Amino acid sequence: MARVKRGVMVRKRHKKLLEQAKGYRGSRSRRVKVARETVMKALWYAYRDRRNRKRDFRRLWIVRINAAARMHGMSYSRFMNGLKRAGIDLDRKILADMAVRDPAAFSRVVEQARQAV
């Protein structure tokens, strides 16, 4: 049986890894061991933050809705309760966008929520 040497595969794997580490500072983009650790950490951060991004945006939407609702004399929790009772099915993303881009429409929604409470 022929002897298998791994030179070609190792070079291919290292090249792929260093390609992923492109743009990193210093030895993080040049040395294979350091680059591997850095890429692994970067991929873990990306995985974690894809999940955190959902939380962060929801938090941002709630802050924006709360601020806009308080400008109309209503707290966030009372506003959301009023929407639920009025049967208005708008999600937080749409409400936050409406509060920023179309304040007139948002004020009409607040009035409907106020009547339902």
Curated annotation (Swiss-Prot):
GO terms for molecular function: rRNA binding; structural constituent of ribosome. InterPro entries: Ribosomal_bL20, RIBOSOMAL_L20_CS, Ribosomal_protein_bL20_C. Gene3D superfamilies: 6.10.160.10, Ribosomal protein L20. Keywords: Ribonucleoprotein, Ribosomal protein, RNA-binding, rRNA-binding. GO terms for cellular component: ribonucleoprotein complex; ribosome. GO terms for biological process: ribosomal large subunit assembly; translation. Binds directly to 23S ribosomal RNA and is necessary for the in vitro assembly process of the 50S ribosomal subunit. It is not involved in the protein synthesizing functions of that subunit. PANTHER family: 39S RIBOSOMAL PROTEIN L20 (PTHR10986). Belongs to the bacterial ribosomal protein bL20 family. This is Large ribosomal subunit protein bL20.
